[in-house]
């Protein structure tokens, strides 16, 4: 029987592994909504009722696929993620929160929301409520929609690619060191294939 890492590498080499490799939660593309993760954990008996699940990607409200769930489902991939999430704050200092349907979750400390008059919820960039909201979850919704915060109108006749690069730059030495340490930890502590999520 192949290890998870060997299974993925075998498939990437266009050879047939012992079974099809499975990625669930290794990246935002393969994530699962936190309410579904909660229901799955309950169905598998992994948690007592009411145990919250961490929201690891708050824009889509993706839930953590923790090691016990990875093992229960035979997941072969683990994510190497940035220190900050889509909204620009770290996934740390967890605090309780509830979805519209009542599902208990844990969100990062800077997950700062504000209710709107229509029952929707506003989210703020980097958790900074002094800034204009950057996303909105509709009343009864499951995830956030980005808000247009454009300051000046688009001049379609004079587009310049540099105008779209202000939020992108080289990865800092600190961030590279974080990725190096985290990749090493995941390699040593798991037998999973490591999927790097550098953002961008």
Where are the model-predicted features located?
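Catalytic cores of TIM-barrel enzymes
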Residues: 1-200
């Amino acid at each position: 029987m192949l290890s998870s890492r060997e299974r993925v590498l075998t498939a990437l080499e266009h050879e047939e592994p012992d079974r099809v490799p499975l990625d669930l939660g290794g990246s935002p593309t393969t994530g699962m909504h936190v309410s579904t993760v909660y229901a799955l954990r309950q169905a598998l008996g992994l948690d007592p009722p009411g145990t919250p699940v961490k929201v690891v990607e708050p824009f889509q409200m993706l839930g953590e696929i923790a090691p016990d769930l990875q093992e229960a489902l035979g997941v072969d991939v683990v994510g190497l993620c940035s220190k900050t999430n889509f909204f620009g704050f770290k996934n740390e200092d967890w605090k309780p929160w509830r979805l519209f349907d009542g599902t208990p979750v844990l969100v990062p400390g800077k997950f700062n929301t504000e209710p709107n008059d229509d029952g929707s919820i506003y989210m703020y960039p980097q958790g900074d409520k002094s800034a204009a909201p950057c996303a909105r979850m509709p009343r009864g919704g499951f995830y956030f929609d980005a808000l247009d915060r454009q300051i000046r109108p688009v001049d379609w006749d004079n587009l310049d690619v540099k105008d779209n690069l202000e939020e992108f730059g080289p990865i800092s030495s600190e961030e590279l060191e974080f990725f190096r340490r985290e990749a090493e930890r995941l390699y040593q502590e798991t037998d999973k294939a490591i999927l790097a999520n550098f953002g961008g």
